[in-house]
Amino acid sequence: MSRYTGPSWKQSRRLGLSLTGTGKELARRNYVPGQHGPNNRSKLSEYGLQLAEKQKLRFSYGLGEKQFRNLFVQATKIKEGTLGFNFMVLLERRLDNVVYRLGLATTRRQARQFVNHGHILVDGKRVDIPSYRVDPGQVISVREKSMKVPAILEAVEATLGRPAFVSFDAEKLEGALTRLPERDEINPEINEALVVEFYNKML
């Protein structure tokens, strides 16, 4: 299954989750798109609930199904902690996500583009792989030639707050994942147990 690249507002309404992080998609119409609007919510089966929760989490990070599933498999190999939370931490440690959390991009999709285009450095070296796994303490910065890119500067200015598990210097346009996040600091709207149940049946 390929990565979804269609209208994020329509997809957000379908999932009942803001994919842009602004919540504007759901402000006026918090029901699935289509002719029947609010009356179009049908009761889901157990499998349907698990699938819907998996899709919510996958679309939140903007990943294709294969990449998302492979990361889940990696999480199953971590011996400490719970599988669902370990999976979410691996998602959070992706470079594109850390760039987004630092406020260098307004969305994860935009953050992925910045990484792909070579705007981002990790410990002073250019990394253009969005899935690169960031370790706590590694310095994420903007390449010198990219420091005046309008979209980056606008994102930094528009960012009102950052998670407690990252640090950021707006003057230097650099920051770091200072520690791994706690469960209550990420995706409170997601029930990761349903995602685990879904893949336990599939793998």
UniProtKB/Swiss-Prot annotation:
Q: Which UniProt keywords apply?
A: Ribonucleoprotein, Ribosomal protein, RNA-binding, rRNA-binding
Cellular component, GO annotation? small ribosomal subunit
Concerning InterPro entries, the annotation shows: Ribosomal_uS4, Ribosomal_uS4_bac-type, Ribosomal_uS4_CS, Ribosomal_uS4_N, S4_RNA-bd, S4_RNA-bd_sf
Q: SMART domains, from UniProt?
A: Ribosomal_S4, S4
The Swiss-Prot or TrEMBL record annotates one GO molecular function as: rRNA binding
What PROSITE patterns does the entry give? RIBOSOMAL_S4 (PS00632), S4 (PS50889)
**One Pfam family from the record:** Ribosomal_S4
UniProt similarity note: Belongs to the universal ribosomal protein uS4 family.
List the protein's name.
Small ribosomal subunit protein uS4
**What is the organism of origin for this protein?**
Streptococcus pyogenes serotype M4 (strain MGAS10750)
